[in-house]
Amino acid sequence: DLHLLSRRQRQMCIRDSLGTTFTFKYQEKEYQTHIQMVGRYNVYNYLTAMLLIHELGYEIDAILALNTKLKAPKGRMELIVYGTNGIFVDYAHTPDATLNVLESAQEFKKGRIITIIGCGGDRDTTKRPIMGEIACKHSDHVIITDDNPRTEDPQKIINDILVGVSGDYEVINDRHLAIAKGMSLLKENDILMILGKGHEDYQIIGTKKIHFSDQEEVEKYIREHIHD
């Protein structure tokens, strides 16, 4: 009985970097609501959760009224605003997840999409060129960097990613420098996607876990360039 209305039936989703407004039909009644999350997959996840809560006896309107209190989990399309730019930190570290978040960004972009991506060491090597290909296909510029290389040679990991890349990209092994470069490239209305670590606050190099946070790196850059 639940239908997410198509664009022909109604403007289904109005998206910007701050959230998604959408219309759905349930038991012959139409509802419009807003969630502070972006991405079509988050709309579907929300509707699934809403129906489960409704089955427990809660009215749809009562559930929708709580939407202002909903926030995406830390590191899941987590937004940091920088002037007209949206910087998203996301845990995407598989081909499917990378495709989902970049397709979501395409839906509301007004400028370019710049993507920072890497792959973990001592993990599935077959996904590396695939993720490189996806990042390049759905971004205007890609920065390939380290992401928990562990005991593998970081350059070997990057070389594996490079097998799938094309177009406008560059390699900056040091993730701190990669994020700073991505931030420096931003022009009006551009989006920066920083993928792979999400909620993690560490970088694993060799067998050592070193403190590192994508969010902190972005916030530090903003503080240092606030008067630029």
Where are these predicted regions, by residue range?
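Short glycine/threonine-rich catalytic loop with a Thr-x-Gly-x-Asp
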Residues: 20, 37-48, 71-76
